[in-house]
Each structure stands twice: as structure tokens, then as C-alpha cells.
Amino acid sequence: MISLITYFGVVHYNFYRRHVSLRSLYIILISMWTFSLAIAIPLGLYEAASNSQGPIKCDLSYCGKVVEWITFSIACISLAITASLTGFAVISLHWYNYKSKTNGVDVPKVTTRARIRLTWTFFALIVICLIELLPFGLVIGNDKSSLQGCDSFYNANELLVQSIISSVETLVGSLVFLTDPLINIFFDKNISKMVKLQLTLGKWFIALYRFLFQMTNIFENCSTHYSFEKNLQKCVNASNPCQLLQKMNTAHSLMIWMGFYIPSAMCFLAVLVDTYCLLVTISILKSLKKQSRKQYIFVVVRLSAAILIALCIIIIQSTYFIDIPFRDTFAFFAVLFIIYDFSILSLLGSFTGVAMMTYFGVMRPLVYRDKFTLKTIYIIAFAIVLFSVCVAIPFGLFQAADEIDGPIKCDSESCELIVKWLLFCIACLILMGCTGTLLFVTVSLHWHSYKSKKMGNVSSSAFNHGKSRLTWTTTILVILCCVELIPTGLLAAFGKSESISDDCYDFYNANSLIFPAIVSSLETFLGSITFLLDPIINFSFDKRISKVFSSQMKFLRSKVFCASSSSLSRNDKIIKDQSQIE
């Protein structure tokens, strides 16, 4: 229609002005849509029936081929008629332009634009004919369009050509349909004017927006921009916002790498190692006699607590950097902190229990044999768990109240300060008590070993393993005291928070955020390293667990080597058979 209207409007202007009215164009347009729907509806239904089952039955062997050929024939006729009419109009316009130039008549710019636009339309139509008719005709001509299921697999060698044809058809068609409106709009005078007007208005709107909001965009002149700066646009009282933004980004980077990514990976590995050691310990515990089970009761408590601590560290650090569910609820933080405090206290109790068991087993063997029965050990372990629950619940509730608003209100600075120092003092007492007990037992064992060597007595391997394991446990506890008490005490003394928020207070004090970020990140980083190394080093000194681990490694090694050797022998046999055949 565009080609015919352009033809009559340029070559036969009087006919176009008298007979081609707006009403007649609407009638022709409605007729085209009606004719297209009348053909498209039945063809579309039969094409759908040939591709999937439905109310209309059309098998692929006969009906599908008939539908394909009918569709192909109608497409050929329609495209041929359209291409012929458009080609006739293009040739006529070019001939009209040539005659006008020969006669010395100036051709209007509107006519030149229409001729160029119609030439592009004709070129696009030729391309569409090629990409629609040739590939489709080749596919149905070779009878490969209905290959499905096993037929596609059996004729896989012939599917490559079909795939290339279909892909090229889609790619070239998409390029044509993308380029067509752009070139057509470019040669249309009215649409080009409207596009230029809209671009000009857009530039004015952008300039007006920058003018109105340049006072609030405090980071506009900064050389480096960060994702979190949009939350700090309201902090307009900063004297040097770019420098504060860089300081805050440094603190964020420290917290997210040394306080989240690396510790989370180490804690995840620690969970895997602790779980493996826990399963091995439980299997060993079931096979031991009552007298030998006593030393592994606290080991089970220790491993269970270490698993919970590592998981809590991952979740707690995730709340500061990831939008996890329930992170804005008091109950979530309360449960999380209660489990974390319970696990820490249970771990400290298991440390103390192992130390006392080792001390009485070496220094007071009769007391250990007669007084410390298996029932007594279970009672002590239950008492440790009960004490941990009783202390962890108020601890966790007040820690959650300090983190987020909830049923327990602690909004004033005096309340927060009192709660922080109270929790810090109680944690100091518990940690120092456990550390003192372990130091006493460790020093006693080393003194006993020194006296035995001086008297010429040879210490047993079990005693040496126990002494080494207890020395490592004491070292772990000292490190825990350092990473738990020193950073918390320093931050509480200087009135700093362990987390960094995107509010204006932290932004205005960004120069002093580096210190709490380093302290908090080191606390989490060293703690994660400790919880990863603890089970590995501890159970390398345990004879029974080391034996189980060694036997499992030997079993896996034998299985792997047997499988590889059998596969190699099988390959050698195949090669020999092939050589004999040749």
C-alpha cells in the first residue's frame, strides 16, 4: 500500500488528489486486515494441529505436509505480488526522477525522500522473500521439516544444514526488522522533526534536573562512585563528602572481605570437618566400653557446639551484607544470638570438662576411676548444657535488643552502655575462669612430664597425645579470649559499633570507621581460622580417630587405584583386540 500511494502521489498526482481519499484508505486497510484474518485463522489452526495434539487432528505424515505446502504457496503468491508492485513503484519513481533531471525540472526533497525510502522498502522485501521462502522451501522440499524424536536422532547428519538454514533465517530476519523502522523514520520528514524535538526536550529536562538537584547530589564532583552512595544523598552537612565516601568504602571492603567472604568460607569448611569428626566420634563411642567412653562425652559436646558456632557466624555476618529473610525481626536475632551464646558456653564447658578429665586421669587415676563414672560424666555434661541455656537466653535477648527494636526496649545510651559492659564483664569472668582452669591443668601435665623424665620414667604415647591436645586446646582458648574480649572491650571503650550502616552518623564519622572495621574483621577472621584448625589439629592427636581416618583413606585409595588399574587393563585389552583384528 505504501508503494502504491507513493507511486500515485508522485507520478499521477492529479489522480491521487481526486480519487485517493482518507475514507478510501481506511476501507482498503480494513479490507486487508479482514482478508489476512480470513486466511491466517484456518492456517494457524492447522499449523498448531500439526505441531501438537488438540481438537483438530492433523498427522505429520500427510496432513502436516499438505498444510506446509499450502502455507508455502500462499506465502509465495503474497510475497511475489507485494514484491512486484513495490518493484514497479520503485522503477517508476527512479524513471520519473531521471526524466525530471533530463528535462531540467527540480525534484522536490519530499519526492527524493520517498524514493529512497521506497527503495529501502523494496530491498527489505527482497531480503524477507529470500529468508522466508528459500529456507522454508528447501526444508519441506527435502522432507526434513517433520523430523522429531528418534527420526531426528537417526538423521542427525542431515540436521546440521537444517539448523544452519533456520538460524540464518531468524538472524537475518531480526536484523531486517530492526533496521527497517530506523531507516524509514530517518527519511520521513515529519517523524524526523518529532524525534529531534523529543531529543531536544530530553536534553532540556536533563539539564533542568541537574540544575534543581545539584545541591543535593553531594557526590557529583567525586572521581569515584560506589553503589551505596545513593543511601547517603541526604547527608548534606558533610564538609568533604568525597574523602568520607572513600573512607567508608575502605571500611566496607574490609568488613565484606575479612568479615564475611573469607570467614564464611572457612566456617563452611569447619562445619564439614566438624561434622565428619562428630560422626566418627559417635561411631567410636558406640563401640567402646563404659570406662573408655568417658573421655569422648565432652568431645561430642565440643564438636556439636563448634558446628553451631560456625553456622551462627555465617548467618550473623550474612545479615550485614545480604538481604536474608526475617533479618528485620527481633525473634530472628534473639534465636540467633541465643544459639550462638549457648554454643560458645557449651564449647567452653567442654574445654573445661576435657581438661579436668585429663588432669584426674593422669594426676589422680584412682579418683578418676572410682569417682568419675560414666553416669557422673553425663550429669556434668547435662549441667554444662543447662548452665549454657540459662546464661545464653538473657544474653541473647539483650544482644538482640541492642541490634533491633523489639519487646525489650534498650534505646537510651545509658541502657546500651550498661548492657554492653555487663555482658562484657560476664563474658570476661567465664572466659578467664575456663582459661585459668586449662592453664592450670596444662602446666600440671607439663610439670608431671618433666618430673617423670627427670626420674627416668618413660611417658606413654597416650599421655603425650593427651598433653599435646590439651596444650592446643589451651592455645585455642587463649586465642578465643583475645578475639572475643579485646575487640569487644576496645569497641565498647571507644563507643564504636561492630557493624557499619549507611546512615549519616557513620558517614560523618567515616574517618574513625577504619579502626572498628579492622578490629571487627580481625575478630571474625581469626575466629573462623581457629574453628577450622581446631578439629584438624585436635584429632590428629587422638589415636582412635586418627586410626579411623587412616583406614578410610586407605580404603578410598585402594578403591580409586583398583578402578584406575581395571580401566587401564580394559583399555589395553581393547587395544590388543583391535591390533589383532587389523
From Swiss-Prot:
It comes from Caenorhabditis elegans. It comes from the Eukaryota. It is a multi-pass membrane protein. One of its GO terms (cellular component) is plasma membrane. One of its GO terms (molecular function) is G protein-coupled receptor activity. InterPro entries: GPCR_Rhodpsn_7TM, Put_GPCR_Chromadorea. This is Putative G-protein coupled receptor B0244.10. Keywords: Cell membrane, G-protein coupled receptor, Glycoprotein, Membrane, Receptor, Transducer, Transmembrane, Transmembrane helix. The chain crosses the membrane at residues 25-45, 70-90, 120-140, 159-179, 199-218, 253-273, 296-316, 329-349, 377-397, 421-441, 475-495, 513-533. Glycans are attached at N190, N221, N237, N457, N538. SUPFAM superfamilies: Family A G protein-coupled receptor-like. Its main location: membrane. Belongs to the G-protein coupled receptor 1 family. B0244 subfamily. It is found in: Cell membrane.
